[in-house]
């Protein structure tokens, strides 16, 4: 539990227990803005290093993501989404950038678990996997300007899908325990 607290994923409240982090709306926005900026930087560095095998791996992640959305399988969705982003991030060649982005992806995945409305019956159809296909196409075209705009739009949509509530959630309510 201390490891989760060190990673910023849970708050430990003495004599009460462990609770999933309870970020403010501003903290959530800060995490997404930083992640967007760092991923745009990584995308620029990775663009000429990506191979057809990478594009195939990214496409496979998109297929998994789409199926997980259809099946409302949040765990598989989060893994596929992280996989998609980390494929190009790892190609940037900057160890520190990779580590920072991976930490931010883990943090924003918690925010998705807490606040995303994709999996509610009334939510609109998800668009993220379609944007991922567009991102792959722009990498293949090596069109950095369009890719930066697409990534910005992608992160704006991600933030727009969140419903930030200011309340603690017990771990069991999220992890099924």
Question: Which positions does each model-derived feature cover?
Answer:
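Short linear motifs at protein or domain termini
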Residues: 1-48, 54, 96, 159, ...
């Amino acid at each position: 539990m201390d490891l989760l607290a060190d990673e910023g994923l849970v708050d430990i409240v003495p004599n009460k227990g462990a609770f999933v982090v309870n970020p403010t709306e501003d903290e959530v926005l800060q995490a997404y803005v930083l992640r967007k900026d760092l991923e745009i930087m990584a995308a620029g560095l990775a663009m000429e290093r990506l191979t057809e095998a990478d594009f195939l791996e990214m496409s496979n992640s998109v297929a998994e993501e789409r199926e997980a959305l259809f099946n409302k399988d949040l765990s598989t969705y989060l893994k596929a989404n992280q996989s998609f982003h980390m494929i190009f991030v790892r190609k940037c060649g900057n160890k520190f950038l990779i580590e920072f982005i991976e930490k931010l992806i883990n943090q924003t995945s918690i925010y998705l678990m807490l606040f995303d409305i994709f999996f509610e019956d009334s939510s609109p159809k998800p668009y993220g996997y379609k944007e991922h296909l567009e991102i792959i196409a722009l990498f293949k075209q090596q069109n950095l300007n369009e890719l930066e705009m697409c990534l910005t739009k992608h992160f704006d949509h991600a933030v727009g899908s969140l419903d930030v509530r200011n309340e603690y959630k017990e771990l069991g309510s999220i992890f099924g325990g």
